[in-house]
Amino acid sequence: MELDLSPPHLSSSPEDLCPAPGTPPGTPRPPDTPLPEEVKRSQPLLIPTTGRKLREEERRATSLPSIPNPFPELCSPPSQSPILGGPSSARGLLPRDASRPHVVKVYSEDGACRSVEVAAGATARHVCEMLVQRAHALSDETWGLVECHPHLALERGLEDHESVVEVQAAWPVGGDSRFVFRKNFAKYELFKSSPHSLFPEKMVSSCLDAHTGISHEDLIQNFLNAGSFPEIQGFLQLRGSGRKLWKRFFCFLRRSGLYYSTKGTSKDPRHLQYVADVNESNVYVVTQGRKLYGMPTDFGFCVKPNKLRNGHKGLRIFCSEDEQSRTCWLAAFRLFKYGVQLYKNYQQAQSRHLHPSCLGSPPLRSASDNTLVAMDFSGHAGRVIENPREALSVALEEAQAWRKKTNHRLSLPMPASGTSLSAAIHRTQLWFHGRISREESQRLIGQQGLVDGLFLVRESQRNPQGFVLSLCHLQKVKHYLILPSEEEGRLYFSMDDGQTRFTDLLQLVEFHQLNRGILPCLLRHCCTRVAL
């Protein structure tokens, strides 16, 4: 009996594994169907996934717990994502809540810092009013916030209508940028000074045919009133991007932007090179131009695009020939960018200064102070002074009597160790800055605006008994030596070798606030520093 030990016949064709459409599963293959000759038993077979297996995997996935998405910002639409939103959302990685207060750090000139909670739409003027009240300072339109970038040696004064939170949000994270609270006498000087002093005739040119018959004064007045926009032109030294060499170009500031000519003073459009957009940039003063940028002069300024957050790349650094030229370019850039809004800020500042009651009563003044009245105790019984002029005259008489008592006390014989000078009344004045250097006094006056009449008094470093009056005139700081002299046991101070003598420095300053004397101008503004 012979047994058939050969392996059973197995079909490896695709038709055996995947039946034809319409054929129920499990139906045997017809026996008379021949095997395909091209299929070999040693070849691998492709087994397609059946629909039953896919349905089982779907049911298994739905039965598992859902895993939260750790990066929902990447799945949000670009308009709602702070990461995919583009430049408009580059102000911060997290959306800001307009209803929540924001913390702004403000520094004083002595380095002290104070944190202030402000609303999202708080302007620079609102923050200055808060700081003035906290510092117990006199409120006026000269206070301002200065945006400083020490790593770039750049700074600019914020306009009164600018949002402090928006400016701070544009700073690089972890940088050394800061706000500094100080006086800025040059903020509205363009509306107070004469047109010729701020905009020289050689730097103002009208590009419109309608202005050919207008005088220089009328053209400047229209410029200040934002009625027209003439060209500001002049030579500036420009450093190319990525280069350390400075080259002199003839530049033009127009409403459309800042340009420089590649061929002399030509205004042909073929020779004009576009530099920066006025509306999309801010202009800064360069504080350490020689050290950081290798400037040939100390009168540099920078045009920084708003989209630039960090680094030197993209900064357009300019260098002017003198301070008057730089002041003209800075003032024109502000007027071209803000236009009539700048003049509105000036009018609002003037109205607040003339009518302080519109701001409400200061919160630092207690209710009991409002009930105080002027009294006269010169007679046997006190009486209420109802006449305001009489009350003012009595206050002046009391102040003069107090000064006489102080002068009498200072004129008493004292040791020659300088104790009388250390107890002098001038040390309590805001314009007295003690023992600072000549360079430091020039820096302080330059920071608060190079306007005529800005002054301070300091101790002399060469003469231990003398003082120095530092005064700004024609955008230059001049220094006048004040020497003491003694006559009949009394001490006097003089700046003209004893021809005009004063009993103390306070009397000297008050005299030159009303009379020029040997000075080129009156003492108008005192350079002061307030601690926060």
Curated annotation (Swiss-Prot):
The modification Phosphotyrosine is found at residues 188, 338. InterPro entries: BPS-dom, GRB/APBB1IP, GRB7_RA, Grb7_SH2, PH-like_dom_sf, PH_APBB1IP, PH_domain, RA_dom. Changing residue 480 to F: Global loss of tyrosine phosphorylation. Abolishes interaction with FHL2 and HAX1. It is found in: Cytoplasm; Cell junction, Focal adhesion; Cell membrane; Cytoplasmic granule. The record marks 511 as: Important for dimerization and for HRAS activation. SMART domains: PH, RA, SH2. Keywords: Cell junction, Cell membrane, Cell projection, Cytoplasm, Lipid-binding, Membrane, Phosphoprotein, Repressor, RNA-binding, SH2 domain. Residues 1-20 have a biased composition (Low complexity). Residues 229-338 form the PH domain. Changing residue 511 to R: Abolishes dimerization. Abolishes activation of HRAS. SUPFAM superfamilies: PH domain-like (SSF50729), SH2 domain (SSF55550), Ubiquitin-like (SSF54236). The keyword Magnesium does not apply. Residues 21-34 have a biased composition (Pro residues). One of its GO terms (molecular function) is RNA binding. Phosphorylated on serine and threonine residues in response to heregulin. Phosphorylated on tyrosine residues by TEK/TIE2. Phosphorylated on tyrosine residues in response to NTN1 signaling. Phosphorylation promotes stress granule disassembly during recovery after cellular stress. Phosphorylated on tyrosine residues by PTK2/FAK1, and possibly also other kinases. Phosphorylation is enhanced by activation of receptor kinases. Tyrosine phosphorylation is essential for activation of down-stream protein kinases. One of its GO terms (biological process) is stress granule assembly. The record marks 239 as: Important for lipid binding and for stimulation of cell migration. It is a peripheral membrane protein. Residues 100-186 form the Ras-associating domain. Its main location: cytoplasm. The PH domain mediates interaction with membranes containing phosphoinositides. Homodimer. Interacts (via SH2 domain) with EGFR, ERBB2, ERBB3 (when phosphorylated), ERBB4 (when phosphorylated), EPHB1, INSR, FGFR1, PDGFRA (tyrosine phosphorylated) and PDGFRB (tyrosine phosphorylated). Interacts with SHC1. Interacts with RND1. Interacts (when tyrosine phosphorylated) with FHL2 and HAX1. Interacts (via SH2 domain) with RET and PTK2/FAK1. Interacts (when not phosphorylated) with ELAVL1. In stressed cells, but not in normal cells, part of a complex that contains at least GRB7, PTK2/FAK1, STAU1, ELAVL1 and TIA1. Interacts (via SH2 domain) with KIT (phosphorylated). This is Growth factor receptor-bound protein 7. It comes from Homo sapiens (Human).
